[in-house]
Structure formats: C-alpha cells, structure tokens
C-alpha cells in the first residue's frame, strides 16, 4: 500500500491528537516543529504558539505571564534562563504544580538530529 506524504502527515497528526499526553517537538533553533491538540488544550495556548515555527521563548513568555510557573518577578530573565536551559539539550524530568493547582510531569529528551521532544502528563 502506498500513501502520499499528505496522507502520512494526516495519519500521524490524528495519532498524536489521540493520545492524552501533550507533546511538542522543537528543532535545534528551538522553533516548534509539531505539537498535538492536547498541548494546546492543556495550556490553553493561542493558535500562534502551536503553529510550526513558533519560537520556544514566546511560549515560555506566554506561560510565565499567566503564572504557569508560579510567581515570576522578572519574566524576561526567566524566559532567558529557561531558553538557555533548553539550548543545553540535556534530558530532563520534572514535576510541577500549575497555576490551576494541577500537577504535571514534563519529560524532555534531545533528538539525535538536533532539537527536543517533550511530553507533558497531567498527574
């Protein structure tokens, strides 16, 4: 059976949107490559932040200004710090309590070709 690239993309998107966990993939320049619908829903993100090419730092800035990371005195410094951490491309796992009181786990792993894949789970 042969499928077109467009069909493969549609099938992959359907599969990613079916899972309950939120997922993002950023390239080596920290630009969004792909995210699933649960990512946008979990964080109530505007479309501009889940469109391929959206900068990682814009998403962090948006979340920080909404209190997603707790009280942040200097949002710009916080965004710079988080972006620098992401650029280190070191695997990580953390659990944090969100502004809505729910706890999520965040697991990130660098990709061999550069970039990140992150999975967010409501625990």
Q: Positions of the model-derived regions?
A:
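Primarily the dimerization/phosphotransfer
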Residues: 17
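Catalytic micro-motifs at enzyme active sites that drive phosphoryl/nucleotidyl and oxygen chemistry
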Residues: 12, 106-107
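PAS-family sensory domains
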Residues: 1-2, 20-87, 110-123
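Short, charged amphipathic alpha-helical "coupling" segments at sensory-output junctions
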Residues: 1-14
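Per-ARNT-Sim (PAS) sensory domains and their PAS-associated C-terminal
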Residues: 83-105, 112-114
């Amino acid at each position: 059976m042969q499928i077109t690239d467009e069909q493969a993309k549609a099938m992959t998107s359907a599969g990613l949107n079916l899972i309950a966990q939120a997922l993002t993939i950023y390239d080596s320049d920290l630009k969004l490559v792909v995210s699933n619908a649960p990512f946008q829903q979990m964080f109530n993100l505007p479309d501009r932040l889940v469109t391929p090419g959206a900068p990682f730092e814009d998403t962090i800035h948006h979340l920080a200004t909404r209190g997603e990371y707790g009280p942040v005195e200097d949002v710009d410094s916080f965004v710079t710090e988080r972006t620098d951490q992401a650029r280190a491309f070191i695997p990580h796992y953390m659990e944090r309590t969100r502004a809505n009181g729910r706890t999520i786990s965040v697991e990130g792993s660098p990709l061999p070709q550069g970039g990140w894949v992150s999975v967010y789970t409501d625990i």
